[in-house]
Amino acid sequence: MYYNKLISVIVPVYNVEEYLEECLDSIQCQTYKNIEVILVNDGSTDSSKDICEKYCEKDNRFKLFCQPNKGLSATRNRGMSESKGEFISFVDSDDVLKEDMLEQLMKQMSVEKVDIVECWYTNDKQELDLPSPKDAEIIFKGNSEEALVSL
């Protein structure tokens, strides 16, 4: 059963003060509670770092790591190197998660007995609706390497 496994939620942060609090609130309110939130500040020049520090002070699941600006890939890699979870979820700093997103992903892993799950998204800001698939036929079956390549 996957329900007791730690998920590392990695959030690259770079000059996103406008969106960041809504993103972090949505992570903090997840129904799946066994998470660590790895915030990697990639040399922000706005108040993004201060916002991250505020969340780290009020919730010990949040951890902040700072680096000079290296770009998104290096920032995600840094987050992975700092993570302790058995599972990893990447969340962009302008994303807002449904409150049960992580729980649903873990549930799907358990039901389907797979190593990797992905979800789609809904873009509320531009009225472009791309809902998550509910049809299990869409689920990729194969080994982890093939699944990663298909993403």
Model-derived features: positions:
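Nucleotide-sugar donor-binding/catalytic module of glycosyltransferases
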Residues: M1-L151
